[in-house]
Regions:
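Conserved SAM/AdoMet-binding glycine-rich loop
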Residues: 99-209, 214-219
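Acidic, low-complexity intrinsically disordered segments
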Residues: 1-100
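Active-site capping/gating regions of soluble enzymes
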Residues: 222
């Protein structure tokens, strides 16, 4: 899109881009999803860090966290779409980079920008990342500070691995401690599993960001 605009080719745009043509709004939907994540590299933050350098002292104290995307879609939503979720309107299909690729790209970003804080923007991490990404980061004694979103039915061993691999905060999608509400949401977890997730996260010093969702049809005070 940017290349076409810079070249002055404004008579047509790539599929998936909404644009104005006279008094009309035109959109040609994408015929297919972008699915081959292996072909994409890490994000380029060169301009951002160049600007920070130019700002000098004015940029001191800024909370610098690099955003990184390892997957799109939701592997749980492919099987059981949580009834409250409005994400992934285009497709729930789960597509993920291989753990080895993510490991290399995060390592390259950390080295290039002298950064240790990362926020994975995936709706839900690939479960293979627990052992094959964070387990490897733990083995290599990488001192990172990572945020992830994941399903809440994690085992003690898995939370221990995540913590050792640098996960300092996570959003496990607890949503409720009521069995009736969890069933209504089609979350695929029990209140006890959610409590266990909170317990072992506290034990391994992983901060948990979570919510209680209210207002479901048929909900009672109990």
């Amino acid at each position: 899109l940017v290349r076409q605009v810079l070249a002055g080719k404004t008579e047509d745009y790539p599929n998936g881009v909404t644009y104005r043509q006279g008094d009309k709004i035109v959109l040609t939907p994408n015929a297919s999803l972008f699915s081959d994540f292996a072909k994409t590299g890490p994000p380029d933050y060169d301009d951002y860090y160049r600007l920070l350098t130019e700002l000098g002292d004015k940029a001191q104290g800024l909370d610098r966290i690099l955003l990184y995307e390892g997957s799109r879609g939701c592997w749980w939503g492919e099987k059981h779409h949580c009834t409250f979720c409005g994400l992934n309107a285009q497709s729930m299909k789960f597509r993920a980079k291989a753990p080895q690729q993510v490991l290399k790209e995060i390592g390259d970003l950390s080295q290039r920008y002298d950064a240790v804080r990362f926020r994975l923007v995936d709706n839900i991490i690939d479960m293979a990342y627990i052992d094959n990404l964070f387990g490897k980061l733990a083995e290599d004694h990488c001192d990172l500070d990572v945020f992830i979103e994941t399903k809440s039915n994690l085992q003690k061993r898995q939370i221990k691995t995540l913590a050792a691999g640098g996960v300092k905060c996570m959003q496990p999608g607890l949503e409720s401690l009521s069995v009736n509400q969890l069933r209504a949401m089609d979350k695929g977890v029990t209140p006890m599993q959610n409590i266990a997730c909170l317990k072992w996260s506290l034990y391994y010093h992983v901060m948990v960001s979570w919510n209680i969702l209210l207002g479901f049809p048929g909900e009672t005070n109990e």
